[in-house]
Amino acid sequence: MNAPLGGIWLWLPLLLTWLTPEVNSSWWYMRATGGSSRVMCDNVPGLVSSQRQLCHRHPDVMRAISQGVAEWTAECQYQFRQHRWNCNTLDRDHSLFGRVLLRSSRESAFVYAISSAGVVFAITRACSQGEVKSCSCDPKKMGSAKDSKGIFDWGGCSDNIDYGIKFARAFVDAKERKGKDARALMNLHNNRAGRKAVKRFLKQECKCHGVSGSCTLRTCWLAMADFRKTGDYLWRKYNGAIQVVMNQDGTGFTVANERFKKPTKNDLVYFENSPDYCIRDREAGSLGTAGRVCNLTSRGMDSCEVMCCGRGYDTSHVTRMTKCGCKFHWCCAVRCQDCLEALDVHTCKAPKNADWTTPT
């Protein structure tokens, strides 16, 4: 009996992953719906009851989240710009990314983390700009305080990131909290990692007051860093993401390979290896790399060898208008000429198999 039971436990993590329902964050589709909050709340498919309640109760927050979707998707596309999968979105798909994120891959881990971070960033910024009725600047940052440079007064408007994190947790995590499967736990972990990433780059900014800028008095406030810092940080976490399996009681993770460290709350986790994204694959949700621009001189992921998966590339000769002969004129302008520049553009060849054009 021991051998069969041991075999069952060995396969259990894989079974939990395979039996995972098709989890996706339908709130991502808020970017496409737009319009009034009522229209948005009623027409975004797949929202759970608590999400719809928050949506109707806080229309101003929903507007911020909706506007933020474009921001974090753009950041995702920036980070993946030189990779085979480039975080492409599908406007007519309510999951925004299609089937590609149904796989519990490291790409899914990154998207859930960056989207959760994007919600925190968008809500917190809207609070500071006075666009949300239920929050404002951080009320805890008042009076005097002390740092390594001495005593200062809290002033200005400190970003109320705790409100942003609290609302993001309630709204973004709602759907995953209803599930007890492996994918839901993975999403919750990566959502939290994304929220923590934004707070990691909260920085103190100060203004000096005194004769000739002597800084006799200082007024300080806390401000979020540019979202690019969060994106760069999560990109590093993506490259160091840890593959995990469910533990035997189904309540948490353990590393898939004992040589790797146990993931912290800041790490991204994933279950399944990624496809190679070389060819268009309906089931995997991959658009392939045919027609993608590649870099002939690079040795990285954007090189023609890697990007084109060994299929080769086509070269076209193009001309483009560019600025040239720029000169500085006192004071204070830079004047340039318009010049035509000839260059070679290299694009990946399509697979020889004609089935690659099958639409996803």
Swiss-Prot record:
Pfam families: wnt
PTM annotation: Palmitoleoylation is required for efficient binding to frizzled receptors. Depalmitoleoylation leads to Wnt signaling pathway inhibition.
Biological process, per Gene Ontology: atrial cardiac muscle tissue morphogenesis; canonical Wnt signaling pathway; cardiac epithelial to mesenchymal transition; cardiac muscle cell proliferation; cell fate commitment; cell proliferation in midbrain; cell-cell signaling; cellular response to transforming growth factor beta stimulus
Signal peptide as annotated in the record: 1-25
InterPro entries: Wnt, Wnt2, Wnt_C, Wnt_CS
GO MF entries: cytokine activity; frizzled binding
Annotated localization: Secreted, Extracellular space, Extracellular matrix; Secreted
Protein keywords: Developmental protein, Disulfide bond, Extracellular matrix, Glycoprotein, Lipoprotein, Secreted, Signal, Wnt signaling pathway
Coiled-coil portions: none
Cysteine pairings via disulfide bonds: 76-87, 127-135, 137-157, 206-220, 208-215, 278-309, 294-304, 308-348, 324-339, 326-336, 331-332
Glycan-modified residues: 295
GO-annotated cellular components: cytoplasm; extracellular space
Lipidated positions per record (O-palmitoleoyl serine): 212
Principal place of residence: secreted
UniProt function note: Ligand for members of the frizzled family of seven transmembrane receptors. Functions in the canonical Wnt signaling pathway that results in activation of transcription factors of the TCF/LEF family. Functions as a upstream regulator of FGF10 expression. Plays an important role in embryonic lung development. May contribute to embryonic brain development by regulating the proliferation of dopaminergic precursors and neurons.
Protein family per UniProt: Belongs to the Wnt family.
PANTHER family for this protein: PROTEIN WNT-2 (PTHR12027:SF86), WNT RELATED (PTHR12027)
Protein name as catalogued: Protein Wnt-2
Source organism (scientific name): Nomascus leucogenys
